[in-house]
């Protein structure tokens, strides 16, 4: 259609329909084939448009936004290999049940398989890592095709959110001319298009299953019988109702007397009032002690959320496979051991609330067996926490001290973004639960180390609250262009973004693994890969304030200065490269020695029989 603006109208209608379905943020990468979408997004008054040069960083930026808001952010890129760079973020969205929409602009079908430039097969580019794929199709003036544009947009948002949140891929083809043209007069499709632009979006009411009453009744009965129960909280996505989730877990603990083993990424550790609840700190450390594991066999485990990161806990449940373990999960089959006795598919907060209400009304007696069991875990937590605190004392800077200081310095109500490999584990080893409210952002879906800075920048834009990111040096190296996003994200001057990089010169998590025994040369060449970098020039290039800390005192001052700034700060916290593994091994040895003396809580009558209940 020469002289037609159908392609522009098509894109405007699509962006408008996305906004009507709930989209508020669109992340745009440069490219010619996506021109109609870019212009439509920039001219829209209903979405915020964020311009990002690098597609991989852009996709993680959108992911970070979605993690904070719970709404799908939209990533838009041009044709060719551009979309492929979004795959890591798409995978993380898929694995972590985070809503995300990727729109890849594409060439028309007649250019496929003909050696046309920047033309690849983009159909189902992301494979099974998306909840839904759709072809938007080439712009078509028919009324049905125009109406289908609004439907496809509504479907994309709906499928990104329910029944299982995750990523959605829309492939949008455009022919040239891609830019708006001077139309010669009214176009035949214009009246239908204008009516659709005025029309309210389709209202989607998702069916939602509640908590199964019979499952709650059966689980409540098991809780009432169990003498050695545990509530285990693995990684969970931060939501607006984090406080409700904490209240529900703590209420269930009070009703049952079961200790709560909560990881730092569970959204339970920071902000809850824990009176009357045993929530032992550093539980991974004491569960690494064989004597403690052998002496304290559980008879019931309620595991909430994603599988815990803790290696100590993994060993514990492997050694007590006869204990009944019930996994409660909103989405996914969260049982990598394939040994759970039951999976309750439902919102953990609702399951905990229902259980607490039923058990609270039953006047459950917390007898001596339960009290002794809880006291043993409380004492083990005190021992582990004491050793962790002593390991971080003084002015010497260590990996554990960095994690502890960063978690303690985060302003109340702010966001702590935690990197993978060692930082997420140091958070659990060295940082005790706190009444100070924090939202903890993490990438435990696929547990990758890429895109962390970009995602934190997206979170900062979405939250308009202070964000602190703790990550390793190789993670930062993976996402250097994210520093540009960090600088831009804080340009509004509303809140700081403080990035703390643990500079231990390489991937030191491998020094904790059996491969470390094969010799230093192999380890360095193939695994830890030290790069001997100084990140000060990178901070200068991207316009971030920079601090270098070699002692605890210097880190404390750098953190304080970072939170005083409205912009972005990069703090390079330098520790000896080969120090971490030896230090944590000593910590675990000290904890093992002291918890071994605790013995076991005496079992009540019937407890052993319940261990064998199918």
UniProtKB/Swiss-Prot annotation:
The keyword Manganese applies. One of its GO terms (biological process) is menaquinone biosynthetic process. Its cofactor is Mg(2+); Mn(2+); thiamine diphosphate. Pathway: Quinol/quinone metabolism; 1,4-dihydroxy-2-naphthoate biosynthesis; 1,4-dihydroxy-2-naphthoate from chorismate: step 2/7; Quinol/quinone metabolism; menaquinone biosynthesis. Binds 1 thiamine pyrophosphate per subunit. Its EC number is 2.2.1.9. It catalyses: isochorismate + 2-oxoglutarate + H(+) = 5-enolpyruvoyl-6-hydroxy-2-succinyl-cyclohex-3-ene-1-carboxylate + CO2. Pfam families: TPP_enzyme_C, TPP_enzyme_N. Signal peptide: none annotated. InterPro entries: DHS-like_NAD/FAD-binding_dom, MenaQ_synth_MenD, THDP-binding, Thiamin_PyroP_enz_TPP-bd_dom, TPP_enzyme_TPP-bd. Keywords: Magnesium, Manganese, Menaquinone biosynthesis, Metal-binding, Thiamine pyrophosphate, Transferase. Catalyzes the thiamine diphosphate-dependent decarboxylation of 2-oxoglutarate and the subsequent addition of the resulting succinic semialdehyde-thiamine pyrophosphate anion to isochorismate to yield 2-succinyl-5-enolpyruvyl-6-hydroxy-3-cyclohexene-1-carboxylate (SEPHCHC). Homodimer. Belongs to the TPP enzyme family. MenD subfamily. This is 2-succinyl-5-enolpyruvyl-6-hydroxy-3-cyclohexene-1-carboxylate synthase. It comes from Sorangium cellulosum (strain So ce56). The gene is menD.
